[in-house]
Amino acid sequence: METLFNGTLALAGRDQETTGFAWWAGNARLINLSGKLLGAHVAHAGLIVFWAGAMNLFEVAHFVPEKPMYEQGLILLPHLATLGWGVGPGGEVIDTFPYFVSGVLHLISSAVLGFGGIYHALLGPETLEESFPFFGYVWKDRNKMTTILGIHLILLGIGAFLLVFKALYFGGVYDTWAPGGGDVRKITNLTLSPSVIFGYLLKSPFGGEGWIVSVDDLEDIIGGHVWLGSICIFGGIWHILTKPFAWARRALVWSGEAYLSYSLGALSVFGFIACCFVWFNNTAYPSEFYGPTGPEASQAQAFTFLVRDQRLGANVGSAQGPTGLGKYLMRSPTGEVIFGGETMRFWDLRAPWLEPLRGPNGLDLSRLKKDIQPWQERRSAEYMTHAPLGSLNSVGGVATEINAVNYVSPRSWLATSHFVLGFFLFVGHLWHAGRARAAAAGFEKGIDRDFEPVLSMTPLN
């Protein structure tokens, strides 16, 4: 099937003759060499953690405390700040040392992982089954595979509980909704009611509902992690103690490539959900660090000009816009008072700077006339001018704007990158699922090389 370009590159047990895969097929050569595959995975983890540590230190070195994080192209420090490290009231950075510590810890960890990866790739045993049966496996061994699945689930559950412990006991996390403009606080009364937590999963994904992406208080987020961590840990114990049922043995393909396809499918779903979360959610991804969401920037613009024109004498409750609808305020189909104009489509935005001006029926006209605070005006003007729009050449804002600034929101980068990676992972899922099913059905060899059309064509040279 494959062409070997250079036989001298081959290593024992990893060449085309013994594995059926050439050097460029990567880890496919290691499908049946558990020791070498371990080395590849540990080394890969080392590269990932090295990037995290190095990029972390790079961001610390370039960080300017006087500017918001989202103006500095940062994607790692906002995550650390959201976890409550180094920030105070209003999301102001008061100490960058925790960020430095995080970078150094990741660099040190990556050195350990790098050593382990090189050791297992070059020096360690080719296979683990003989010497270390606990760590050895055969891809067809369904019982062993579900045990490995269980161990992974327990580790994921522990990860979820790490966030819970940080929020409850280790200094708390940043809450953008804290009174007075956001602050780090310990989460005391978790939401553990299953009807609330699982109610998110049953919501519609569309406007005004927003599925799990609509979560807007930290009690629910941390409570959700308690539920998820518990489910992962108990599910992990279950999978370690049990063997797959007959229906699962029949329904699933039990091969290394099949497991790869399942994993890629799961990661793809994670990528798409993360994309929606970082784009729309300003509680898990506070606007103080990531910049405003798209709807938030749009509503902020409407609010900013409502404030300006009200000062100039406009009656914002009755002014008509060019379409005959309200220029500043209008009613949604269900009767709430919402901002008028193009931003009406973002009527369901919730943001800490806007909610104090709402009453039981949407925006409260008397509060808009009497209660707008200077901090709300400043915040909305700032968000209006930092919309998560931007082109590849890093000129942010609306594409036709002549006074554009050199700004692209981290929200744009994080949402776009997770969408693109989620898509690639989905294609990889389809590819490997197709190959795994074909192999299980016994026709994985592909097209017949003896009658390939290219063989009857004139050579290129």
Curated annotation (Swiss-Prot):
<dbReference type="GO" id="GO:0009535">
    <property type="term" value="C:chloroplast thylakoid membrane"/>
</dbReference>
<protein>
    <recommendedName>
        <fullName>Photosystem II CP43 reaction center protein</fullName>
    </recommendedName>
</protein>
<dbReference type="GO" id="GO:0045156">
    <property type="term" value="F:electron transporter, transferring electrons within the cyclic electron transport pathway of photosynthesis activity"/>
</dbReference>
<keyword id="KW-0150">Chloroplast</keyword>
<feature type="transmembrane region" description="Helical">
    <location>
        <begin position="243"/>
        <end position="263"/>
    </location>
</feature>
<keyword id="KW-0479">Metal-binding</keyword>
<comment type="similarity">
    <text>Belongs to the PsbB/PsbC family. PsbC subfamily.</text>
</comment>
<feature type="propeptide">
    <location>
        <begin position="1"/>
        <end position="2"/>
    </location>
</feature>
<feature type="transmembrane region" description="Helical">
    <location>
        <begin position="279"/>
        <end position="300"/>
    </location>
</feature>
<keyword id="KW-0157">Chromophore</keyword>
<dbReference type="InterPro" id="IPR005869">
    <property type="entry name" value="PSII_PsbC"/>
</dbReference>
<keyword id="KW-0472">Membrane</keyword>
<keyword id="KW-0464">Manganese</keyword>
<feature type="binding site">
    <location>
        <position position="355"/>
    </location>
    <ligand>
        <name>[CaMn4O5] cluster</name>
    </ligand>
</feature>
<keyword id="KW-0812">Transmembrane</keyword>
<keyword id="KW-0793">Thylakoid</keyword>
<dbReference type="InterPro" id="IPR036001">
    <property type="entry name" value="PS_II_antenna-like_sf"/>
</dbReference>
<keyword id="KW-0597">Phosphoprotein</keyword>
<feature type="transmembrane region" description="Helical">
    <location>
        <begin position="57"/>
        <end position="81"/>
    </location>
</feature>
<dbReference type="GO" id="GO:0016168">
    <property type="term" value="F:chlorophyll binding"/>
</dbReference>
<feature type="transmembrane region" description="Helical">
    <location>
        <begin position="166"/>
        <end position="188"/>
    </location>
</feature>
<dbReference type="GO" id="GO:0046872">
    <property type="term" value="F:metal ion binding"/>
</dbReference>
<dbReference type="InterPro" id="IPR044900">
    <property type="entry name" value="PSII_PsbC_sf"/>
</dbReference>
<keyword id="KW-0602">Photosynthesis</keyword>
<dbReference type="GO" id="GO:0009772">
    <property type="term" value="P:photosynthetic electron transport in photosystem II"/>
</dbReference>
<dbReference type="Pfam" id="PF00421">
    <property type="entry name" value="PSII"/>
</dbReference>
<keyword id="KW-1133">Transmembrane helix</keyword>
<feature type="transmembrane region" description="Helical">
    <location>
        <begin position="122"/>
        <end position="143"/>
    </location>
</feature>
<keyword id="KW-0604">Photosystem II</keyword>
<feature type="modified residue" description="Phosphothreonine">
    <location>
        <position position="3"/>
    </location>
</feature>
<dbReference type="InterPro" id="IPR000932">
    <property type="entry name" value="PS_antenna-like"/>
</dbReference>
<comment type="subunit">
    <text>PSII is composed of 1 copy each of membrane proteins PsbA, PsbB, PsbC, PsbD, PsbE, PsbF, PsbH, PsbI, PsbJ, PsbK, PsbL, PsbM, PsbT, PsbX, PsbY, PsbZ, Psb30/Ycf12, at least 3 peripheral proteins of the oxygen-evolving complex and a large number of cofactors. It forms dimeric complexes.</text>
</comment>
<feature type="transmembrane region" description="Helical">
    <location>
        <begin position="435"/>
        <end position="459"/>
    </location>
</feature>
<feature type="modified residue" description="N-acetylthreonine">
    <location>
        <position position="3"/>
    </location>
</feature>
<keyword id="KW-0148">Chlorophyll</keyword>
<comment type="function">
    <text>One of the components of the core complex of photosystem II (PSII). It binds chlorophyll and helps catalyze the primary light-induced photochemical processes of PSII. PSII is a light-driven water:plastoquinone oxidoreductase, using light energy to abstract electrons from H(2)O, generating O(2) and a proton gradient subsequently used for ATP formation.</text>
</comment>
<dbReference type="GO" id="GO:0009523">
    <property type="term" value="C:photosystem II"/>
</dbReference>
<keyword id="KW-0007">Acetylation</keyword>
<keyword id="KW-0934">Plastid</keyword>
